[in-house]
Regions:
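The Walker A/P-loop phosphate-binding site
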Residues: 4-123
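Conserved NTP-handling cores and scaffolds of large molecular machines
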Residues: 81, 110-117, 185, 208-211, ...
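Phosphate-binding/switch region of NTP-binding enzymes
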Residues: 194-198, 202-281
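Intrinsically disordered, low-complexity regulatory regions enriched in Ser/Pro/Gly/Thr
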Residues: 50, 85-88, 136-137, 208, ...
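Conserved inter-motif catalytic segment of the P-loop NTP-binding fold
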Residues: 88-187
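Preference for well-ordered, secondary-structure-rich cores of eukaryotic proteins
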Residues: 36-42, 63-64, 69, 147-152, ...
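Hydrophobic/aromatic beta-strand patches that form the interior of the parallel beta-sheet core
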Residues: 56-58, 93-95, 143-145, 216, ...
Length: 281
């Protein structure tokens, strides 16, 4: 499956001199309106979204499922919206800094989504070949940038507009994780992680807002129970993942400006399964 992915080498990314770009209002409106919708990306977490340009943070302790949840969202993003699969049929960029992301796991999640779909009689997927073809075609929607140091990461963030211009179907920017080079960047200058992330998001938002692209990033929180902070204006959804003490269960705290919800979940080989309290329905 790896041959069907699009890898962007950092060395191929160049900083180009700024050139004036002339675009009519009609052209701008067309470019923004043609962007695929991310509605249905993860219905349990985003009942009416996420909207394009939203910022979504996935935080949590080690082994709480941060990269797994991100992979599940990427699978939904790049899968088609036909065959009753209800994918977003959108392209996505993954900036891979921690190198915890596994292609094999993404393919497994995509296969699981297809297998569990309630397929209508007229659109039935009859053979394994058809499922494999769908997965291979969908993987072409994912652009992966492997990053190995803070200088490469900075270069990538400042040249995102070139990548967005080359593919108008890109609706999602994923970063795993945004804090991978925190210590490299801040070894000579004491900066809090929140301040560091805020600085990076400012750079990211300048380009994602222009091109109508949502952002999802992961970050490690070692002391999640002691790190309760108010949602900032830069983040639209804050997702905190945590393992319940002396248990195999997990709990997700979802925070927006309007609400704070706690959702229990389990991590299975075929994806994260949410356990919704019937009183919330």
């Amino acid at each position: 499956m790896k041959n069907f992915l699009i890898y962007i080498r950092v060395h191929d990314i160049q900083i180009k001199p700024m050139q004036p770009q002339i675009e009519s209002g009609a052209e701008l409106l067309t470019r923004l309106n043609e962007k695929p919708s991310l509605h249905g990306l993860e219905d349990t977490l985003f009942s009416e979204g996420p909207q394009n340009t939203d910022i979504i943070e996935i935080g949590g302790e080690r082994s709480s499922g941060k990269t797994f949840l991100l992979s599940q969202m990427l699978a939904k993003c790049i899968l088609p919206n036909n065959y009753a699969i209800k994918g977003c049929n959108a392209s996505a960029i993954l900036i891979n800094t921690d190198h915890h992301f596994q292609i094999s796991k993404l393919v497994e999640l995509m296969s699981s989504i297809i297998n569990t779909v309630n397929i209508s009689f007229s659109e039935a997927i009859d053979t394994e070949f058809d499922k494999t073809t769908i997965i291979k075609d969908s993987l072409r929607n994912l652009h992966i940038i492997d990053c190995y140091n803070n200088e490469q990461f900075s270069l990538i963030l400042r040249t995102l507009d070139d990548i967005f211009l080359d593919n108008t179907k890109i609706a999602l920017l994923a970063i795993d994780s945004i804090t991978a080079y925190y210590w490299q960047d801040c070894e000579d200058n004491i900066t809090t992680i929140d301040t560091y992330i805020k600085k990076l998001l400012k750079i990211i938002k300048l380009q994602t807002t222009r091109f109508n692209v949502a952002t999802i990033y992961t970050k490690l929180c070692e002391n999640i129970h002691n790190e309760r902070k108010c949602l900032t204006n830069n983040i639209d959804y804050k997702i905190q993942l945590c393992k319940v003490c002396n248990s195999t269960n997990f709990i997700c705290t979802l925070e927006t400006i309007q609400i704070i919800r706690k959702i229990h979940y389990s991590i299975l080989s075929n994806g994260i399964k949410w356990k919704i309290d019937e009183t919330e329905r």
